[in-house]
Amino acid sequence: MDLDLLKKAVDASSEGIVIAEREGDDNILIYVNKAFERLTGYEADEILFQDCRFLQAGDRDQQALNDLKVALEHDESARVVIRNYRKDGSLFWNELSISPVFNELDQLMYYIGVQKDVTAQIAAEQRADKAEEELRLLKQKFGIE
């Protein structure tokens, strides 16, 4: 397949796509597509050859990050929803799917990450949860089962 065509196809994706390479305990970004740049506000040349932990901006106390770490330690695929932060500091909820890429000797070479902004979906779920809790409290207050 023509590599130029492949790059154009990946850059045309509406979801952020990254390729990372393991380097010690880090997974270093070696490629990000245009959608990743739009999603995060970072240009590729600002963030390549860094671990993508910078997207958490110190917000590392997330169960999903622990789940992701376990998957990475076992060279497995994973899908998690994590809090990330754009270059301007604004929060977004990131549905991250990662998949390992192995060579012909079954050795881990890279991880492919696909990132999708699910902030609106999470906000809707939080509003629904709040409404359900308010309804439960009203029922409790008035003795309605």
Where are these predicted regions, by residue range?
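PAS/PAS-like sensory domain cap-loop motif
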Residues: 36-47
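Sensory modules in modular signal-transduction proteins
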Residues: 1-25, 29-34, 140-145
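PAS-family sensory domains
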Residues: 22-23, 83-88, 102, 107-120, 127
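Sensory-domain boundary/capping and coupling elements
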Residues: 122-140
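PAS-family sensory/regulatory domains
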Residues: 48-59
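Sensory-domain boundary capping and coupling elements
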Residues: 96-98, 115
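Terminal output helix/cap of sensory domains in signal transduction proteins
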Residues: 58-90
